[in-house]
């Protein structure tokens, strides 16, 4: 991750009914619960949950995690099921739904896709605010009758992925999935909006080689790394093979074949 001055944030309740929830989030995240004219981002607590808004005249709008409606719901219903490239990359096949550790969870979009296909997914996010957005989205998803069974297959851990993988206790994940931050070329409005949130808070993953090394040591069957299509491979061992899409590429590091369980 790049080293740079942390952006200024403050927590804001969007209604009087949300004041107590805002106070709890402010305390938990160690952020001020007051207006700050110098703040670059507002962490807003409203009836629809937690969201982060970049402040200023050119704000792209709030970012939140929503597994019930919007893009995640559309992809769940119409995204191509087990024929999706991410499904092929992690090894989803008839009768095979691998246990996946998504070690760079972000807003949980890829983890949700895998859980919707039947995989048990453990998500790890090291940036506390991004993890809070993800936790809030999962909590709301668990209250929706259609999405609750999917959310039940998702478990969230906060912390440094490389450290967690090195100290892993218990049954190892069959697949470790990595999507390190990289100067993305995806021009979609949604991705650009999210990147404007992520970059100041998270930066690029300069420790991607260490992540890959820890993932290869932990995964029992394979490691999958998502990259922009023309990006170089992560420094370290070469992948066994790759799957290429229009804008993304999945580098697969196989260790042994996935079997029906």
UniProtKB/Swiss-Prot annotation:
UniProt xrefs under InterPro entries: 16SrRNA_methylTrfase_J, SAM-dependent_MTases_sf
GO biological process assignments: rRNA base methylation
Pfam family, one: SAM_MT
Entry keyword annotation includes Nucleotide-binding: no
Enzyme class of the recorded protein, top EC level: transferase
EC number of the protein: 2.1.1.242
Binding site for S-adenosyl-L-methionine: 109-110, 125-126, 179
Record's keyword terms, sorted: Cytoplasm, Methyltransferase, rRNA processing, S-adenosyl-L-methionine, Transferase
Origin superkingdom: Bacteria
Catalytic activity: guanosine(1516) in 16S rRNA + S-adenosyl-L-methionine = N(2)-methylguanosine(1516) in 16S rRNA + S-adenosyl-L-homocysteine + H(+)
Example of a GO MF term: 16S rRNA (guanine(1516)-N(2))-methyltransferase activity
CDD domains reported for this sequence: AdoMet_MTases
Location of this chain's protein in the cell: Cytoplasm
Keyword Signal carried by entry: no
GO (cellular component) term, any one: cytoplasm
Function according to Swiss-Prot or TrEMBL: Specifically methylates the guanosine in position 1516 of 16S rRNA.
Membership in a protein family: Belongs to the methyltransferase superfamily. RsmJ family.
Matching PANTHER family: RIBOSOMAL RNA SMALL SUBUNIT METHYLTRANSFERASE J
Protein name: Ribosomal RNA small subunit methyltransferase J
